[in-house]
């Protein structure tokens, strides 16, 4: 084999460039919400798994929370079932909840675990029901009627997070596992709930006081009025952009999860373009990142 010194030098430069970021995040907890195109494109699936293994290998503690809405939709369609949505939230009756649990806690979760392990990691799959990891309650939702009056909407077994059993996750991390969590929760009566994966990721980051929360999406990040990605926002600026309509629609719940996490002590949260190969590494190991960072300290984008 002939050694190409130019290629070797480039590799060495890349590795040394990453060194300050590795030092910054070593022994830190990173919560990554995995969803969108990154879960349906084989090349992106592979790059995500390798990214997670690399983070663990260099001394960080990644925790993965995954979605799986499209996979649930596909199985419901195969079974001839229809599932309504209200403001993006799936109406989940008991039989639909059984299917959701089977897909998220079964095939999707184990597929991610297997892929991470294939690339040299040691992942372990969980749902919020395991060891009462995610204590949930029924999500109460209101919708404004034609008369302008708020009316309650029953979404069925759709939940909100009450608490996260951080001891379980910390025990797994201490044993060198990579936790992979399906967004299901359980209430005190043993009822199972389907919970938004962004919300679960945000609450896991909050209860564990993670260094960073990363939400992988199918968009570039928060767009300004000029259509360009806003690379950094403070919580106060986010409030202003929601108020003036710059941040609107489906982005609001996602940005609210990130905002709540930062206001609860998570150092930074970032909306990441999961369609970019190795987006997780690019966000952690470069100043520019691949999305919109939300933090009280925007110098994190320039150090």
From Swiss-Prot:
Binding residues annotated for substrate, in chain numbering: 68-69, 90, 194
In terms of InterPro entries, this protein maps to: AceGlu_kinase-like_sf, AcgluKinase_fam, ArgB, Asp/Glu/Uridylate_kinase, Glu/AcGlu_kinase, NAGK-C
Q: Give the positions of the site Transition state stabilizer.
A: 33, 254
Known catalytic reactions: N-acetyl-L-glutamate + ATP = N-acetyl-L-glutamyl 5-phosphate + ADP
One Gene Ontology MF term: acetylglutamate kinase activity
The alphabetized UniProt keywords are:
Amino-acid biosynthesis, Arginine biosynthesis, ATP-binding, Cytoplasm, Kinase, Nucleotide-binding, Transferase
Q: What is its main location?
A: cytoplasm
- One Pfam family name from the record? AA_kinase
- Tell where it localizes: Cytoplasm
Name the PANTHER family for this protein. N-ACETYLGLUTAMATE SYNTHASE (PTHR23342), N-ACETYLGLUTAMATE SYNTHASE, MITOCHONDRIAL (PTHR23342:SF0)
Q: What does this protein do?
A: Catalyzes the ATP-dependent phosphorylation of N-acetyl-L-glutamate.
Q: NCBIfam families, from UniProt?
A: argB (TIGR00761)
Query: Under what name is this protein listed?
Result: Acetylglutamate kinase
From what organism does this protein derive?
Answer: Psychrobacter arcticus (strain DSM 17307 / VKM B-2377 / 273-4)
């Amino acid at each position: 084999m002939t050694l190409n010194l130019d290629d070797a030098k480039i590799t060495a430069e890349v590795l040394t460039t990453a060194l300050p970021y590795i030092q910054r995040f070593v022994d830190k907890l990173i919560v990554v919400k995995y969803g969108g195109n990154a879960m349906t494109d084989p090349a992106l699936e592979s790059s995500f798994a390798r990214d997670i293994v690399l983070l663990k290998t260099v001394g960080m503690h990644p925790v993965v929370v995954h979605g799986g809405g499209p996979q649930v939709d596909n199985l419901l369609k195969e079974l001839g079932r229809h599932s309504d949505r209200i403001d993006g939230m799936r109406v989940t009756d008991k039989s639909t909840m059984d299917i959701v649990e089977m897909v998220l806690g079964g095939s999707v979760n184990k597929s991610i675990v297997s892929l991470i392990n294939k690339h040299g990691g040691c992942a372990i799959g969980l749902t919020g029901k395991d060891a009462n990891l995610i204590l949930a309650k029924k999500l109460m939702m209101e919708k404004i009627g034609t008369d302008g009056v708020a009316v309650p909407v029953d979404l069925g077994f759709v939940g909100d997070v009450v608490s996260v059993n951080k001891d379980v996750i910390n025990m797994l991390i201490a044993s060198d596992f990579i936790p992979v969590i399906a967004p299901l929760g359980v209430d005190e009566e043993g009822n199972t709930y389907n919970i938004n994966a962004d919300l679960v990721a945000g609450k896991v980051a909050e209860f564990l006081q993670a260094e960073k929360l990363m939400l992988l999406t199918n968009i570039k990040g928060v767009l300004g009025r000029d259509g360009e990605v806003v690379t950094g926002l403070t919580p106060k600026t986010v409030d202003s952009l929601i108020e003036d309509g710059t941040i609107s629609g489906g982005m609001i719940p996602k940005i609210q999860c990130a905002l709540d996490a930062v206001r609860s002590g998570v150092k930074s949260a970032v909306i990441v373009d999961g369609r970019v190969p190795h987006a997780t590494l690019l966000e952690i190991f470069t100043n520019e990142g691949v999305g919109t960072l939300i933090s009280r300290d925007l110098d994190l984008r320039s150090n």
